[in-house]
From Swiss-Prot:
It comes from the Bacteria. This is Transcriptional regulatory protein QseB. Phosphorylated by QseC. Residues 124-218 bind DNA.
Length: 219
């Protein structure tokens, strides 16, 4: 899951990025309003964490512009502003959730997962295809009831495929979802992760659509 983080406090931002990365998220972090605003137009993010008090451009103005221009990515406002009127204003501008500082990182992750789940029309946090189940909340995947030992990028790729059943995902899109701008990505990184998942889940679990990308095989 790829997350856009716009937060000017370096201590908080570094903690969020490091913590979410350990949980399997891919995070791009911006400390100023305008670059953060523009980032949403240049990469396929699953959700956004947006602070309100930002240098260069206020978070509320950023959110207003995104919604006016049709950007529908779920937005979690994370801010020290805890006045009721400001929370209501943020939600009415188009925010999907609101969390006041201080916060627990596990709650940030849980709220992001809930936002993405609602945006994709999924009622349950558990994803399933055939004998494979995956729970993003506790980072557990199973095959026929037995735990699967997956590396973080393998888990992220499996989650991406399960959230997009019936769709063919272009290789470039998969790469953009799995990696942030700071990552050093080899040219065959996606193919390597697909190969490893097939070894663990079966060769027919992921189907290659030549010239396009990958999709789930028959359950």
């Amino acid at each position: 899951m790829r997350i856009l983080l716009v937060e000017d406090d370096t201590l908080i931002g570094d903690g969020i990025k490091a913590g979410l990365s350990k949980m399997g998220f891919s995070v791009d972090w911006f400390t100023e309003g305008r670059p953060g605003k523009e980032a949403l137009y240049s990469a396929p993010y699953d959700a956004v964490i947006l602070d309100l008090t930002l240098p260069g451009m206020d978070g509320r103005d950023i959110l207003r512009e995104w919604r006016e221009k049709g950007k529908q990515e779920p937005v979690l406002i994370l801010t020290a502003r805890d006045a009721l009127a400001e929370r209501v204003e943020g939600l009415r501008l188009g925010a999907d959730d609101y969390l006041c500082k201080p916060f627990a990182l596990i709650e940030v992750a849980a709220r992001l997962e809930a936002l993405v789940r609602r945006a994709s029309g999924q009622a349950s946090s558990e994803l399933r295809h055939g004998q494979v189940t995956l729970n993003p909340g506790n980072l557990v995947a199973t095959l026929a009831g037995e735990p699967l030992a997956l590396k973080p990028k393998e888990f992220a790729l499996l989650e991406l495929l399960l959230r997009n059943k019936g769709r063919v995902l272009p290789r470039k899109l998969i790469e953009e979802k799995l990696y942030n701008w700071d990552d050093d990505v080899s040219s065959n990184a996606v193919e390597v992760h697909v190969h490893h998942l097939r070894r663990k889940l079966g060769s027919e679990f992921i189907r290659t659509v030549h010239g396009i990308g990958y999709t789930l095989g028959d359950a």
